[in-house]
């Protein structure tokens, strides 16, 4: 079986790699992706352009710039960005580089400033990007046409959107509406947001770490139910040994997820995907106390999912919203082909009690934090995979687990919740969601290449999968 994509017939190794990167063939039973898409440095440069800079990417949550003149720095691929809130309460985003000689303006992660002054030559800008003052800009130091009609203001992000507090940006001025980009994953994000009739907030503090591996390793792993019992066996065993009647941390019981087959996976448009499970002990989660209010506000079926199901939601290409052992926003920033930065935050309903907030944070620290029982395990596997991918003896990663029971379209759980996934995995260990995501990756990359015919000598062909 083959899917018509766009590829070239010229000598470009990058183009040829993308064209043959993914096999998604039910007839032959080949469901796999090439390992060198994780190691090719030339390919990485095009990923930054087509996957990150021309796509919508997550920038921040609006609670991180809650007050007038708050700012937070972020990235759209290789482009440094400042997200600001002005005195009128409006949130906007500009490139974090002085319009004079390109020096980075904001050199701290976040703060509160009504103006930004470049440390290099002293130019001053409003926090919405307008050039206010040029050092020694009077008299005849500059030509007559200098700073006309905003020519030297900071560069605004071409596309900027706020979906219910989640802020996204793109360097593509023709990016589709954010709701269209989110597609079917929007309903899952709504489940997270609707846990409170009020607002969510990102809690103070964050953790950032860099691992030695490609960015796609983390994007796969956040929805990989297959690795839990082997990589996180120590955490699973620890949970099994804990006395849940004592005053120790009470957390989600992960010991029965795989044994009882109480979960699955969904893939959505634009590379988004979901890993979900049914909770054996939902009473340990903070949202459990809101179940009656939720039923009245969002309906019994959705309330049941919010309270009794976990969610590992990937908003492709750089965001995970985790709602399981605790609640986490995980932001992925590629640095190079084999180096990736991850920044993690805990989020919560703004109106929850101190007791519930403390329990949430303890659960978060237990597994998610850099010093928790989960993160170090994953980072070692990312390093080991990246090292193994450098070998050339075997070219492919097998992604066929669960293929006999993958479902095209929604399963019963999805239909009950009004979801419309492209594909459903009947078990949480199923790997079909990675095949779908990498297929979208290849399609997006090849569409970008098609727009550069002079570079790639592009012609339409059939790309075997």
Curated annotation (Swiss-Prot):
Domain of life of the organism encoding this protein: Bacteria
PROSITE patterns xref list: RIESKE, RING_HYDROXYL_ALPHA
InterPro entries: Rieske_2Fe-2S, Rieske_2Fe-2S_sf, Ring-hydroxy_dOase_2Fe2S_BS, Ring_hydroxy_dOase_asu_C_dom, Rng_hydr_dOase-A
Positions contributing to [2Fe-2S] cluster binding: 98, 100, 118, 121
Short name of any one Pfam family annotated for the protein: Ring_hydroxyl_A
Class of the enzyme per the UniProt entry, highest EC level: oxidoreductase
Record has Metal-binding as a keyword: yes
The protein's annotated pathway: Xenobiotic degradation; benzoate degradation via CoA ligation
GO biological-process terms attached to the record: benzoate catabolic process via CoA ligation
Catalytic activity: a 2-halobenzoate + NADH + O2 + H(+) = a halide anion + catechol + CO2 + NAD(+)
Keyword tRNA processing: no
Keyword line: 2Fe-2S, Aromatic hydrocarbons catabolism, Dioxygenase, Iron, Iron-sulfur, Metal-binding, NAD, Oxidoreductase, Plasmid
Residues of the Rieske domain: 56-154
Residues annotated as binding Fe cation: 227, 232
Annotated cofactor note: Binds 1 [2Fe-2S] cluster per subunit. Binds 1 Fe(2+) ion per subunit.
MF terms (GO), sorted A to Z: 2 iron, 2 sulfur cluster binding; 2-chlorobenzoate 1,2-dioxygenase activity; iron ion binding
E.C. no: 1.14.12.13
Cofactors, names only: [2Fe-2S] cluster; Fe(2+)
Function: Component of 2-halobenzoate dioxygenase multicomponent enzyme system which catalyzes the incorporation of both atoms of molecular oxygen into 2-halobenzoate to form catechol.
Stated family: Belongs to the bacterial ring-hydroxylating dioxygenase alpha subunit family.
Subunit comment: Heterohexamer of 3 large (CbdA) subunits and 3 small (CbdB) subunits. The heterohexamer is part of 2-halobenzoate dioxygenase two component enzyme system. The other component is a NADH:acceptor reductase (CdbC).
Protein known as: 2-halobenzoate 1,2-dioxygenase large subunit
Source organism of this protein record: Burkholderia cepacia (Pseudomonas cepacia)
Highest classification ranks of the organism: Bacteria, Pseudomonadati, Pseudomonadota, Betaproteobacteria, Burkholderiales
Gene for this chain: cbdA
